[in-house]
Design a protein with these regions (language model features):
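Helix-rich interaction surfaces within compact, conserved domain-sized segments
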Residues: 13, 65-105
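A short, ordered amphipathic alpha-helix with a cationic face
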Residues: 18-24, 55-58, 66-67, 79-80
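Gly/Ser/Thr-rich helix-start
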Residues: 18, 62, 98
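Metallocofactor- and cofactor-centric catalytic cores in central/energy metabolism, strongly enriched
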Residues: 30, 35-54, 58-59, 66, ...
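N-terminal first-folded block
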Residues: 4-37
């Protein structure tokens, strides 16, 4: 199983870099993950989406799709693509330390 070292801690990840155990995630790790995805600074809106992703995963066992994010996170789909240009659901899930949402390529 692949691993990554984030914030000085070794964590188990899958072949695409998504956490195997979301409980290992910290906000400091999120900052490092965001930088690796080309996001230099996490704004309040980024954190809103990240925390929403983690809440949805905790409640439903999967991260939300872009459509669900746009309708229920308080951030529009257009804003989601501005915040996470490489793909809102996939990149936000990776930064949030949860598995890739179903339906993401």
């Amino acid at each position: 199983m692949p691993t990554a070292t984030l914030d000085g801690t070794q964590v188990a990840v899958n072949d695409e870099g998504f956490f195997e155990s979301p409980d290992q995630w910290t906000e400091a790790m999120a900052v490092e993950l965001a930088r690796a995805e080309g996001i230099d600074e996490l704004t309040d809106q980024h954190w809103q989406v990240i925390h929403f992703m983690r809440k949805e995963y905790a409640e439903k066992g999967t991260g939300p799709t872009v459509r669900v994010l746009g309708k229920t996170s308080g951030v529009s789909v257009k804003e989601l693509y501005e915040l996470f240009p490489k793909g809102p659901a996939k990149v936000a899930a990776k930064i949030a330390g949860i598995p890739k949402p179903r339906g993401c390529i």
